[in-house]
Amino acid sequence: MSSKTLAKFLEENLEDLKSKGLYNVIDPLESSNGPIITIGGKEYINLSSNNYLGLATDSRLQEAAIGAIHKYGVGAGAVRTINGTLDLHIKLEETIAKFKHTEAAIAYQSGFNCNMAAISAVMDKNDAILSDELNHASIIDGSRLSKAKIIVYKHSDMEDLRQKAIAAKESGLYNKLMVITDGVFSMDGDVAKLPEIVEIAEELDLMTYVDDAHGSGVLGKGAGTVKHFGLSDKVDFQIGTLSKAIGVIGGYVAGKQNLIDWLKVRSRPFLFSTAVTPADAAACMRSIEILMESTELHDRLWENGRYLKQGLKELGFNIGESETPITPCIIGDEVLTQEFSKRLNEEGVYAKSIVFPTVAKGTGRVRNMPTAAHTKEMLDEAIRKYEKVGKEMGII
């Protein structure tokens, strides 16, 4: 007999979400996640993917994955610390370290796992974390898991960070202090003020932790936000995902050799989860090699990002202050935003709405993610549909 308490909880809360329009319906794809996708037998121009460089469908990665399956099988067979570490994992980590300009790196099964692993391996209840108010959910959860005191500072407000860091330092309550920020903030596409953050950190002896999920492959000629600012030797923790620009799955922490050595013996997702599959490891390594060999995909991504931004801006849409190819189209009202996204969908443009509580009330937006794989013809068609729907709904 199943729990009546659970049944009541689920029924009431699911109904509440649905009545408020906050229940997320998942659309399964019947195609690869490229610039054109198929859902329910209909083709859409895809502006919702994190596949920034189009590498998720690249034949070179497919060949690497197939080769690894033939050699190693489909699974690693154990956790890394028993006998699940393949020579392929070591090569991947060496490639990541070279890519990120650090001494060493450690690979995890997901980007989310990285933040659950690294923060709690170093911070505890006697420490404090200074965290940007718009940091990713995995940073928030990883910080909570560590049991450290979490001190939130206003988004990219360096004076607020400085004052709160000074207060934490002078209180004498904490053994260690860490400042954590996203490299690129995914909702607005703005970039963290890393030079100022590093300056404050050096002044007050804060550990520096940058989650570059949306910066790797995009900034710094592909090497990420830290490299973009020339701070590779100044940031203690460089976190990244292998599922966005890299196009596969997994995540990593890059930094000093002694940090990586510590994470290998103290980060629980590394110790208690089976290793990344051979196919994924091989595909990730090939993807990073492609990025280090050429900036062609990186340059095309930025060209397409500028093209879409210009087209939407000229139509009169509010695209915010994005500093990256991420292009939010800010509508404001939550209901209007969701209806706008629905109408775009009907016109063959797949661009999902993002509303409260993911973003602040009154700042609902449709977030567009142009990729290196989009053609100008695809973007022109999307811009035409934006114009049609925007005028029909009185948004422009």
Swiss-Prot record:
Pyridoxal 5'-phosphate binds at residues 111-112, 186, 211-214, 241-244. It holds the Pfam family Aminotran_1_2. CDD domains: KBL_like. Keywords: Pyridoxal phosphate, Transferase. The modification N6-(pyridoxal phosphate)lysine is found at residue 244. GO terms for biological process: biosynthetic process. It is an enzyme of class 2 (transferase). One of its GO terms (molecular function) is transferase activity. Its EC number is 2.3.1.-. Substrate binds at residues 136, 358. Its cofactor is pyridoxal 5'-phosphate. SUPFAM superfamilies: PLP-dependent transferases. InterPro entries: Aminotrans_II_pyridoxalP_BS (IPR001917), Aminotransferase_I/II_large (IPR004839), AON_synthase_class-II (IPR050087), AONS_Archaea/Firmicutes (IPR010962), PyrdxlP-dep_Trfase (IPR015424), PyrdxlP-dep_Trfase_major (IPR015421), PyrdxlP-dep_Trfase_small (IPR015422). Belongs to the class-II pyridoxal-phosphate-dependent aminotransferase family. Homodimer. PANTHER family: CLASS II AMINOTRANSFERASE/8-AMINO-7-OXONONANOATE SYNTHASE, LD36009P. This is Putative pyridoxal phosphate-dependent acyltransferase. It comes from Bacillus anthracis.
